Amino acid sequence: MKVLGIDTSTKTTAIGLIEDDEVLCDYNLTGRVAHSESVTDMIHEIFEKFEFGLEDIDLIAVGIGPGSFTGLRIGITIAKVMAFALDVDVIGVSSLVANAMSDYGLVSTIVDARRGNVYASIIKNSDEPEVLFEDEILPFEQFKDEVKKYDVITIAGLDGDKFIGEIDNAKLSKNKSMRGSNIARLGLIDYKKNGPMNAFNLVPNYLKISQAEAQYEKNNETSK
């Protein structure tokens, strides 16, 4: 199967293409260009380099976050429109899990969610990712307690270098940016297990801080 992967959950636009287990290409663009422009431009450029066209795609996978609210809406909308126009299946996957799939072993993706909070997940990655800590938004200080449960863990994500110095048992991934091929790979794994998603049910994963976590943060600020 040829799978197109799209992620716009961060300031990086990531587009990747795989055919079964083979990565055909990865394109990344980080900067001020609007996701809506960069996604379409990058997809057009990709298919100029291959002997097959966009109409030969079998599945579209898209990162559903958590991450940038605006970015997620753009990426998911583009994926839905393309799937409808091409009459192919579409599937949404965790951007955090996909980001961690560039490394093996215990890997955590950490994204700055502001005000002392992070979006985070933990996986054990080999041929397929095993999720040990589901996507969540929580105070970074609280997440550090979660990470301490493991001997050594790799920290991935664009914001990893902001937090690595505060985690004693961690090392920084060399693969900081999202890869669209990881989105495509995770999409294919989920598709084989669960089949396609109903496009109407494909929505961003807007994680919101819970009341308990908000109180934890408030107590921390009060004690400073």
Where are each of the predicted segments found?
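Phosphate-handling active-site elements
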Residues: 50-55, 84-93, 195
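Acyltransferase
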Residues: 173-224
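DPxDG-like acidic metal-binding loop motif
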Residues: 59-89
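Residues at secondary-structure transition points
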Residues: 30-41, 69, 73, 77, ...
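N-terminal beta-alpha supersecondary unit
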Residues: 1-64, 177
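Surface "functional belts" at beta-alpha junctions
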Residues: 22, 89-178, 206, 211-212
